[in-house]
Amino acid sequence: MAAKIRKGDQVVVISGEDKGKRGEVLRVIPRENRAVVRGVAVAKRHLKPRGMGQPGGIQEQEAPVAISNLMLVDPKSDKPTRVGFRILDNGNKVRVAKVTGQVIES
C-alpha cells in the first residue's frame, strides 16, 4: 500500500486522547501502521541510573499513533485533507490533496 503519510508531513490528530493536536511526523512505522508525531501521545519513560556518569530520571518521548487517527494538513489551505494519488504525464505517482486538488510535495 502506498504511503499517504510520510516523514516531515504536518498532520492533525482526528480521534483519541490528543484529538485536535497538530504536529510534524518524525517517523513512520509502515509494518505497524503507526507514526510518531512531535508533541502528540507523549509518554513518560522511567530510566534507571546507568553507571557513574548517567543519572536516572523520567524522560518524556512521543509514542507511536495509529495512522488511521491522523489526517494530513494541506500545505496550501492549512486545513486537514484526505489524500489521493495521481499519475503525472511523466509517469511519476504523486500525492494529491482531495480538498484542493493540489499536488503535495514530498
Curated annotation (Swiss-Prot):
Pfam families: KOW, ribosomal_L24
PROSITE patterns: RIBOSOMAL_L24
One BP term from GO: translation
Keywords, alphabetical: Ribonucleoprotein, Ribosomal protein, RNA-binding, rRNA-binding
Listed CDD domains: KOW_RPL26
Subunit structure: Part of the 50S ribosomal subunit.
Protein name: Large ribosomal subunit protein uL24
Organism whose genome encodes this protein: Granulibacter bethesdensis (strain ATCC BAA-1260 / CGDNIH1)
